[in-house]
Amino acid sequence: MSIDWNWGIFLQQAPFGNTTYLGWIWSGFQVTIALSICAWIIAFLVGSFFGILRTVPNRFLSGLGTLYVELFRNVPLIVQFFTWYLVIPELLPEKIGMWFKAELDPNIQFFLSSMLCLGLFTAARVCEQVRAAIQSLPRGQKNAALAMGLTLPQAYRYVLLPNAYRVIVPPMTSEMMNLVKNSAIASTIGLVDMAAQAGKLLDYSAHAWESFTAITLAYVLINAFIMLVMTLVERKVRLPGNMGGK
């Protein structure tokens, strides 16, 4: 099959917005980056919290962490997106729900719903990475910290977590890259990210190959940058003689 490529389409004036089609893609690129960064911050903080809970010697707290993981990990992500956008606002107190649905700009609604959904979904995966890393550490580290007079929270803060985070840099890199790719699902609830902009470009120009090739390359570049940065981080923080450190 012969494909008639026309990359000049990106420099043509878009039908609205006082910009070019390339401007549409660039706008979507910025939204994707902003969503990914905000969602990752939520995922890292919440995932670390529940990952710690899953390792503490308290059945209730450990069970709470397990419940969180099972809830978010076993429901399809696209279902969670629509739940956050359509269902959660209805469960909020009436004034807050009405403010979210009627007064907040729709684009902000889409962004907040997507950010919370993607962040909390990824947090369940981060939780398991943190749990596995803490449990992989020699038991003597925790015992030695407690023997030195540190409280359990202090042992986690000063001994266990610094070592655990060094161990999980590679799997955390994979989770960051997965988050960027999963962000494309946000377009299904109305967020105008790269995937949505490519769809618009296709609708108005009928250039499917160029539209989706462009955003494919954009996603590849984003994740290649993440891989490069995290590889440098891994080399910087790894411990000699520990988990492949040299």
From Swiss-Prot:
Residues 54-73, 125-178, 233-246 are cytoplasmic. This is Glutamate/aspartate import permease protein GltJ. Residues 29-230 form the ABC transmembrane type-1 domain. Disruption phenotype: Disruption confers resistance to cellular contact-dependent growth inhibition (CDI) CdiA of P.luminescens strain TTO1, but not to several other tested CdiA toxins. GO terms for cellular component: ATP-binding cassette (ABC) transporter complex, substrate-binding subunit-containing; membrane; plasma membrane. It is a multi-pass membrane protein. Residues 1-32, 95-103, 197-211 are periplasmic. It comes from the Bacteria. The chain crosses the membrane at residues 33-53, 74-94, 104-124, 179-196, 212-232. PANTHER family: GLUTAMATE_ASPARTATE IMPORT PERMEASE PROTEIN GLTJ, MEMBRANE COMPONENT OF AMINO ACID ABC TRANSPORTER. Its main location: membrane. Keywords: Amino-acid transport, Cell inner membrane, Cell membrane, Membrane, Transmembrane, Transmembrane helix, Transport. The complex is composed of two ATP-binding proteins (GltL), two transmembrane proteins (GltJ and GltK) and a solute-binding protein (GltI). Pfam families: BPD_transp_1. Belongs to the binding-protein-dependent transport system permease family. HisMQ subfamily. InterPro entries: AA_ABC_transptr_permease_3TM, ArtM/GltK/GlnP/TcyL/YhdX-like, MetI-like, MetI-like_sf.
